[in-house]
Amino acid sequence: MASGYGDASQKIDYVFKVVLIGDSAVGKTQILARFARNEFSLDSKATIGVEFQTRTLVIQHKSVKAQIWDTAGQERYRAVTSAYYRGAVGAMLVYDITKRQTFDHIPRWLEELRAHADRNIVIMLTGNKTDLEDQRAVPTEDAKEFAQKEGLFFLETSAMEATKLEDAFLTVLTEIFNIVNKKNLAADENQSNSNPASLTGKKILVPGPGQVIPGKKACCSS
């Protein structure tokens, strides 16, 4: 698997929509800027409404466009909820490791996500701002325990230092890719079984490490 910032002229095999959710000021906008453009600004202003950026990567020799959506964490912007989650196949559930309240609000964000998104959405619990370790208010073990209980992936990151951010997104995108391909493989097998003359050897796709998600759903178009 390789990653990059993409070539606008290259053929796109898949488009995966991933949403960033969590309280205001946990670093969602910085996470988006770091992943999409490899940029970081301490002067980043609070998001108004919704915005998204894209980045194209190569996963298992296929070109995948990641469409990353960022939304305001403030309650007054929650009217965008349904449209924001529509079509999302991945989510980064972000809290600030230096602000306990942002972690305590994660169950509410997760409940909202599960109420509006596809039931098989791939979710990464993301503890941001590890560059402020001396101000930590959320023990890593608390987040690990919550992620395990809820069946989520989990990583701690720093948008400022670009620590583990790539890993977090690639884990989510690769898991989505595997789910989509396993669904496609099953569809191919069903088609072959209905037409004995077309039976051929099938390539078995072995999923990468991480959560095995029941019920696969193809969600994106090339």
UniProtKB/Swiss-Prot annotation:
Subcellular location: Cell membrane
Lipid attachment points (S-geranylgeranyl cysteine): 219-220
Keywords: Cell membrane, GTP-binding, Lipoprotein, Membrane, Nucleotide-binding, Prenylation
Record Gene3D superfamilies: P-loop containing nucleotide triphosphate hydrolases
Binding site for GTP: 22-29, 70-74, 128-131
Main location: membrane
Membrane topology recorded in Swiss-Prot or TrEMBL: Lipid-anchor
Pfam family, one: Ras
Entries under InterPro entries matching the protein: P-loop_NTPase (IPR027417), Rab_GTPases_membrane_traffic (IPR050209), Small_GTP-bd (IPR005225), Small_GTPase (IPR001806)
One GO cellular component, as annotated: plasma membrane
Keyword Lipoprotein (UniProt): yes
Placement of sequence motif Effector region: 44-52
GO molecular function: GTP binding; GTPase activity
Family: Belongs to the small GTPase superfamily. Rab family.
Protein name per Swiss-Prot or TrEMBL: Ras-related protein Rab11C
Gene designation: RAB11C
